[in-house]
Amino acid sequence: CIINGEEVFTGTTTTQVIPHNHGHVLANVHLAGKAEMEAACEAAVNAQQAWIDIGLEGRCAIFERCADLLAGDWRMRVNAATMLNQSKTAFQAEIDSACELIDFWRFNCHYARGFHDDFQPLVSPEGVQNSTEIRPLEGFVLSITPFNFTSIAANLPSAPAIVGCTGLWKPSRNSYHSNYVLMQLMMEAGLPPGVINFLPGSGAEITEVALANPDFAGLHFTGSTAVFQGLWQEIGLALPNLRSYPRIVGETGGKDFVVAHPDCDRQGLLVALLRGAFEYQGQKCSAASRAYVPRSVWNAIRDDLVSEISKIKMGDARDFTNFMTAVIDQRAFDKISGY
């Protein structure tokens, strides 16, 4: 755990193993209990006024520094952590934990400045100065993040922070290690204590603690539809005890598809079907799980598609000839095996 800028060792631990090498323990993780979660809520609330006072430019400077660090000396470290923790190939790690997160931090700052600059009042009567101020939520934001994108995991707590919010970061149990490395990066970039509090632990417990706190102000979530619906219901039940109406932002799963036109680029379609369905073992919300292909096109590409699928190599993420590696855990393996 990292609470108010300090590492906390609770003594309640779990291990993080490499998905493609179960005998290799990657990290021993100290899990947050209710006491640590309550302390994190308090730290986030106490840190908010100073974080607001830094101003938008000060906050953007910190997260643009995060992007610079990730584009530089931290790039290989974060990519390696993602390769080992989530069993991503070097290519998948690079487009995720480096490229996408660098873009998140830089574009978020760009658009935050745009909100501030572009929506100022057009007219101020003589003797009056009208202005618009970006105000954060009054309280803390709970960010519950997924395993499958290291970039999204860091974006969920940091996007609200850029506009002045403080909060709790509950990482997925399958990506504690890589997410912890990014928390260290943000601290090195100058993130003040208490702005983001890193809490590996039970999702049910952290939700219970957060919703019991009157200062709960928002949820930022990426994960399954069922879990998100359950959280929404719990927030609704908690409303009488909260100081404000929480903002709820969530992204959930889908059944993505590929539609082919009779005049399509058939080689391009073949590549799209292969990469869309099989890269990162299909563990993406953007993974292709259905295809609608005209019979004439299907007859032309079917044999090539089957042939290319048979050539896909699976194994250790450190072997750059492998296109696929392991799925994230036993539960995912059992689900796939049951199809």
Q: Could you tell me what each predicted segment is?
A:
Residues 22-116:
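Glycine-rich loop-to-alpha-helix module at the N-terminal edge of alpha/beta enzyme cores
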Residues 23, 44, 59, 164, ...:
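Residue-level signal for inorganic ion chemistry
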Residues 170-172, 200, 262:
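Short beta->alpha connector loops at strand-helix junctions that form conserved
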Residues 159-161, 210, 240:
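Hydrophobic/aromatic ligand-binding patch that stacks against planar heteroaromatic rings
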Residues 1-26:
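Hydrophobic face of amphipathic alpha-helices that form TPR/SEL1-like repeat modules
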Residues 185, 190, 212, 218, ...:
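ALDH superfamily catalytic-core signature
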